[in-house]
């Protein structure tokens, strides 16, 4: 198994892509640190991993709180004895006209999607450097890191920012043997996107966004995350791995 004796910390791990990635890492032998703002949901995922025979520990984490992030990583390291991968997955999005988008909502999206990713990545990198261990950071990106969509101004801006952050962190952290990559999903069916699937017309529109004429499933993203975090991708850093079913080639607004 690719991650035996490795410890993986996942933010936004309570549902959708985060949950599935936690299960996938555990299946490959990893200790999984399940973090989320919703502790009850994080515990549920950790219990699910443990019930399947995996090793996991839940933590409540607000990714915008630097002190809390430092404490969580320190506690995870004390509990498992290592910290090898950080999957920066926590994120939110808005669907509202930019003319009606409040500054409070703008700041919330940017704070979680950009500042939260930076805090997680920076804290993890410092941990690796202080402990003289190599590390892997994987960031959940989006097709909107290179394009746009109606009424998602803050979200699109945040994903463009994290795309640049991925490249810059990869350049700056390579000398410490820390790789930084991102995965760029198309529309994945998760609790966050469930509103797209409420009727046939909406579902068909989602299909038409992709050249493959279907939406993605969380396991199709978790497979990409595990690849980027594994030794199979040992010469890969600064990349944004596209897993979008041909979204950028086949979208039809």
Where does each model-flagged region fall?
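Alpha-helical segment proximal to the catalytic Tyr-Lys
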Residues: 126, 171-175, 234
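Canonical Rossmann dinucleotide-binding motif of NAD(H)/NADP(H)-dependent dehydrogenases/reductases
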Residues: 3-33
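Short, small/polar-rich loop/turn modules that mediate ligand/substrate recognition or access, typified
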Residues: 87, 174, 179, 236-238
């Amino acid at each position: 198994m690719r991650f035996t004796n490795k410890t993986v910390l996942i933010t936004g791990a309570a549902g959708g892509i985060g949950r599935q990635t936690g299960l996938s890492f555990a299946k490959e032998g990893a200790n999984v640190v399940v973090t989320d703002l919703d502790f009850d949901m994080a515990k549920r995922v950790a219990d699910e991993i443990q019930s399947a025979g995996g090793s996991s520990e839940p933590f409540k984490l607000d990714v915008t709180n630097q002190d809390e992030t430092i404490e969580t990583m320190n506690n995870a390291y004390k509990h498992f004895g290592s910290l090898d991968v950080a999957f920066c997955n926590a994120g939110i999005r808005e669907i509202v006209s930019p003319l009606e988008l409040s500054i409070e909502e703008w700041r919330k999206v940017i704070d979680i999607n950009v500042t939260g990713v930076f805090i997680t990545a920076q804290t993890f990198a410092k941990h690796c450097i202080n402990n003289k261990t190599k590390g892997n950071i994987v960031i959940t990106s989006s097709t909107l890191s290179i394009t746009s969509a109606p009424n998602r101004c803050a979200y699109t801006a945040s994903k463009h920012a994290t795309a640049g952050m991925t490249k810059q962190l990869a350049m700056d952290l390579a000398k410490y043997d820390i790789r930084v990559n991102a995965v760029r999903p198309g529309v994945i069916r998760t609790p966050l996107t469930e509103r797209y699937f409420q009727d046939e017309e909406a579902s068909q529109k989602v299909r038409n966004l992709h050249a493959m004429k279907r939406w993605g499933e969380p396991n199709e993203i978790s497979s990409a995350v595990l690849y980027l975090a594994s030794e199979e991708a040992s010469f890969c850093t600064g990349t944004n791995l596209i897993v979008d079913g041909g979204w950028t080639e086949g979208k039809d607004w």
